[in-house]
Amino acid sequence: SKFLIELFSSDAMKNDGAVLLFRTKSANFDNLKKLTPGDNIRVSVTVLPATFVKGPPEHKVRLQGANELLKLGYQISMNIDPIILTTDTVKTYKKIIDDIKTYFDYSSERFHRITIGMLRFGSKNLDNNIRKRHVDLYRHTKTSKMVKIPGDEKHRYDRELRVELYKSLVE
């Protein structure tokens, strides 16, 4: 990261409009804390409920780490992706949104954006990878309201369901 931050912090890169984006599910930001970020250096942190993520730290820990980076001058984005439909989806993801408000200074001018996305798979991924590596998720795709979108070749929740969920999350 040091090499990349130094490279992207150069005047030439800044003048060209180059942006360096680190995407992570980690809360270990020790290497970034030692460096001085330029205005074009962003860190994008994925925050998901522990129910669906095995391995990465709890989302509150990631939010706190991201907040520390924000205070050090990094631009921060949040990703809530993928949203997986369950009986408690709205409650679960509204809790994450509330935790962003609690553990992260989203009013900072260094806060870049929040992106939200639903679970989706390319047909090849579904058959070749997901079925073998994530049996429960594969079963979910077969028993939920996921459909293959013509022309897109991706399995997604149907549009009406996605729009309904997005609306309920922003209310």
Give the role of each language-model region:
Residues 1-7, 55-65, 91-101, 158-170:
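Well-ordered, non-membrane alpha-helical segments in soluble/globular domains
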